[in-house]
Regions:
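Structural signature of hydrophobic alpha-helical transmembrane segments
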Residues: 1-10, 50-58, 107
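Hydrophobic, membrane-inserted alpha-helices
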Residues: 11-15, 36-41, 58-66
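Membrane-water interface at the C-terminal end of transmembrane alpha helices
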Residues: 15-18, 68-76, 111-135
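Short, hydrophobic transmembrane alpha-helix segments
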Residues: 18-26, 45-49
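Cytoplasmic-side transmembrane-helix entry/capping segments in multi-pass membrane proteins
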Residues: 26-35, 54-59, 78-84
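Small-residue-rich segments of transmembrane alpha-helices in multi-pass membrane proteins
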Residues: 34-45, 63, 86-94
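Membrane-helix boundary connector in multi-pass membrane proteins
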Residues: 72-79, 88-105
Length: 140
């Protein structure tokens, strides 16, 4: 069930953002990636261990750096941050023993992250294609 909810939520969030034009600002998807990267830190608070908090902070930092690159350099880095975080969700329990993580979280988060990454990649490609078409039309 967590996979279905993760996929559905990503479709709703990304679809609504695109439909409403909220994602026209280049900061939108990098900000989503930064938020996604931060959740395990909240679970580390529930765990109560400083070691877990430091481990989660180090992992989050990797994805936050990628998200910042998605804002500063190329939106493809936001795709990498989201998709990479989804892959990390599969292995998180091997990286950190965070007792605060709900049992359904890794599956939910992985489903959301990977779905969002695919959607954002599709949006980037569609917009690039649209820009090329507009340039050809103007050039005629």
């Amino acid at each position: 069930m967590e996979y279905i909810i993760g996929i559905t939520l990503a479709l709703v969030v990304c679809g609504a953002a695109a439909w409403l034009g909220m994602d026209r600002e280049r900061v939108f998807y990098p900000a989503v990636a930064m938020a996604v990267a931060s959740y395990y830190l909240a679970f580390a608070v529930a765990d109560g261990s400083n070691e877990v908090m430091l481990s989660e902070a180090a992992i989050a930092a990797v994805f936050i750096v990628a998200a910042v690159a998605g804002f500063k350099q190329s939106p493809w880095f936001a795709v990498v941050a989201l998709g990479g975080h989804g892959v990390m969700d599969l292995f998180h329990h091997h990286l950190v023993h965070n007792a605060g993580v709900p049992q359904v979280w890794p599956g939910f988060c992985m489903a959301f992250d990977v779905t969002a990454a695919v959607i954002v990649a599709g949006i980037i490609l569609a917009r690039a294609r649209g820009e090329r078409v507009q340039q050809r039309v103007r050039g005629r």
